[in-house]
Amino acid sequence: MKRALFPGRFQPPHWGHVYAVREILKEVDEVIITVGSAQFNYILKDPFTAGERIWMLREALREGGIDLSRVVIIPVPNVENNLEWLGRVKSLAPPFQIVYTGNPFVALLFKEAGYEVRQQPMFRREQLSSTRVRELILKGDPQWEELVPKSVAAIIKAIGGAERLRIAALGEAEPHKW
């Protein structure tokens, strides 16, 4: 079985992520999505919990017509040592042969560890980024809903995501400031 790893934070998942998974599954039997920075939540850069992101990803992929039996989603907490992070990913994920990433540093780590690394398939990269989605939510601009699957927008609304981001923007929840 040919498996690929697709790491990301998915804060929140958007249509570009759905496109990437669909394209990856054209080349492999199964994709392992690692939800990174799993220990962070309720802060501006990482407002959603790992569980919420897994929920959003599953619903987004389902909405995108992706066969969830070919997808494994696992949370991966960050560690301060990058090689330890790599080891943690390898220990938490089923065996994989290929890594898809748009992050040059992640690509370097996996290449040096002997993995085949491929460029993450991109779709409308100028518009589709989780950072942009969070910025639009924070501004109260309803255009953010066009960038994510309807299921993701519904989850963000159901959990009070806009209010969470507004409060996170105050900076009181940033652990490094305590």
UniProtKB/Swiss-Prot annotation:
Reactions catalysed, semicolon-separated, are: beta-nicotinamide D-ribonucleotide + ATP + H(+) = diphosphate + NAD(+)
Tell me its EC number(s), please: 2.7.7.1
List the GO cellular component terms.
cytoplasm
Top-level taxon: Archaea
Q: Give, as in the UniProt entry, the pathway in which the protein acts.
A: Cofactor biosynthesis; NAD(+) biosynthesis; NAD(+) from nicotinamide D-ribonucleotide: step 1/1
Q: List the disulfide bonds.
A: none
Kindly state a single biological-process term from the GO annotations of this entry: NAD biosynthetic process
Q: Name one Pfam family in it.
A: CTP_transf_like
UniProt-listed HAMAP family? NMN_adenylyltr
User: What family is this?
Assistant: Belongs to the archaeal NMN adenylyltransferase family.
Q: What is the protein name for this chain?
A: Nicotinamide-nucleotide adenylyltransferase
Q: What is the species of this protein?
A: Pyrobaculum aerophilum (strain ATCC 51768 / DSM 7523 / JCM 9630 / CIP 104966 / NBRC 100827 / IM2)
